[in-house]
Amino acid sequence: MQPPSPASLPTAASSPAIEARHVTKHFDGLTVVSDMSLQLGRGEILGLIGPNGAGKTTMFNLLAGSLKPSSGGIFIEGQDISSQAPEQRIAHGVARTFQIPRPFPEMSVLENVLVGAQKQTGERLFSNFLRPGLVRREEKAALEKAHVMLEFVTLSRLAHEPARVLSGGQRKLLELARVLMADPQVILLDEPAAGVNPPLLEVIMDRVVALNAEGKSILLIEHNMDMVSRLCSRVIAMALGKLLDQGSPADVSANPAVVEAYLGGGA
């Protein structure tokens, strides 16, 4: 696996793929994220790190659309998408994974990937009767694409197995394949290394690098600093709901304030 070279990647300020501007989030009077701004550059792999309680998961969910900011905004190409739900953000090319994937256990691996297919005419009841030819063509194209995605994530041999037989790492690869069915340009990865054995983690990292080489912009939350340092050209560290530091993985991890935040728990 060849990790991306920081010198070869655009800076976030050059052309952000997605950005948060002065975002604050309150829960019942408790401020979990306070005046946070960040930009994910086009073609960048950005790491978001911090101790438990730092607010990074809330920040991630604000970017993904699972939460709406109390103030500030989330923007794509200058458009405020703060009020849009995750399924609406897919239309803007933004998709996410979850720390704990929950596939449909009795459906096959292939069928789980097909769930991610977007804008299928056959989803509308009467289209099956009025436009059967179009429905069949779209279903065929989606099936072919799903097989390509399974090949990409190295799960082709398990295509017809029920998803319940997959290991934790394989479920993360399955979820990545499902996300890719939507052709996202911005991919938000929620702790992709959590619960994954070392061989499968290498596969996941290799796939992330391959996606980045295709021009995908990727933001990941991760506690595995080895993964962060190998994948990310830039890292943002949070503590107590605020920006603590940003820069290269080496510089941020060497910052005494970041070290203290981790040792102190950050909450």
Name these PLM-found stretches.
Residues 72-79, 91-92:
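Conserved ABC transporter NBD signature motif
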Residues 125-158, 206-209:
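Conserved ABC ATPase "signature" region
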Residues 64:
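Helix-to-loop junction immediately C-terminal to a conserved catalytic motif
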Residues 187-191:
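Catalytic Walker B motif of ABC-type/P-loop ATPase nucleotide-binding domains
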Residues 49-51:
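The feature captures the beta-strand-to-loop junction immediately N-terminal to the Walker
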Residues 228-230:
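A short, surface-exposed alpha-helical micro-motif characterized by mixed small hydrophobic
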